[in-house]
């Protein structure tokens, strides 16, 4: 949908800009398309997953490592430069996709992509390299950032789907289908919970009723 919407917006924008800018139709079409596509890929997933959390979870120090790695990778992109530096945050974003929820992953991807677009536009990240094609730098940068942004979002939703299936499997294994109470194996696993203190005495009575 983002690709189709970006193409339609690019056609309308290029036609309307021909009489204003001194460029031809095709360079304007490429510029409009790259801008609309990168913006859509970054913003639309973030808006679709946006929600107000009911209870703010407690973050531990080790849970912040993917976000810290993401910040370090963006700084490395600025320091090293070059066209390949735009892909430096990709491993950190995939790490975030594995560890965080889709909502947090989409938000981090949006912020990272927006920061990289601003840095490239202001020449903070220098991606100027010799190329046999006369392609504007921002066109290449926008498409590269949009492509990078798709990967962690796909991983995040794949991990969320796998976790949902695992919860369904655990629910069927640990709970009785009719009564929705613990099965024998589920009760044993619950009793192994580390929240139960070792000094705490506990009496368990099992009543197995055939139905």
Residue ranges and their predicted role:
Residues 170-190, 207-210:
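Conserved nucleotide-binding and Mg2+-coordinating catalytic segments in signaling enzymes
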Residues 100-157:
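N-terminal membrane insertion elements
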